Amino acid sequence: MRTLSLLLALLFLAAQTLAQPIDEGAEEVITEEPEITETQDPTTIMLIERGIGGDSTDATRSTITCYCRSRCRMLEKNSGTCRSSNCTYTLCCKKTS
């Protein structure tokens, strides 16, 4: 009997949710990305890579350099997008030792 009343309550809530009008005036969430152009200095990120054992004493330092370009060059990886002057570009990153 409890199960039946629980199912009826869930069915009632689902029907109420579907019957409510959708608010078309809801605000949009806009996320802004940092603006980077190809002529500006590249973004450089220092990373510490850990060895297989995860031991911090075996850490080696490497640098990842990122540019905003229309296309990634050889050995660069597409790491997302960036915007400049209402244009969207590819964020191209390259790992150097």
UniProtKB/Swiss-Prot annotation:
This is Defensin-A2. GO terms for biological process: antibacterial humoral response; antimicrobial humoral immune response mediated by antimicrobial peptide; cellular response to lipopolysaccharide; defense response to Gram-negative bacterium; defense response to Gram-positive bacterium; disruption of plasma membrane integrity in another organism; innate immune response in mucosa. Belongs to the alpha-defensin family. Has antimicrobial activity. It comes from Ornithorhynchus anatinus (Duckbill platypus). Residues 1-19 form the signal peptide. PROSITE patterns: DEFENSIN. It is found in: Secreted. Disulfide bonds join C66-C93, C68-C82, C72-C92. InterPro entries: Alpha-defensin, Alpha-defensin_C, Alpha-defensin_N. GO terms for cellular component: extracellular space. Residues 20-61, 96-97 form a propeptide. Highly expressed in intestine, expressed at lower levels in spleen, and at very low levels in kidney and lung. Keywords: Antibiotic, Antimicrobial, Cleavage on pair of basic residues, Defensin, Disulfide bond, Secreted, Signal.
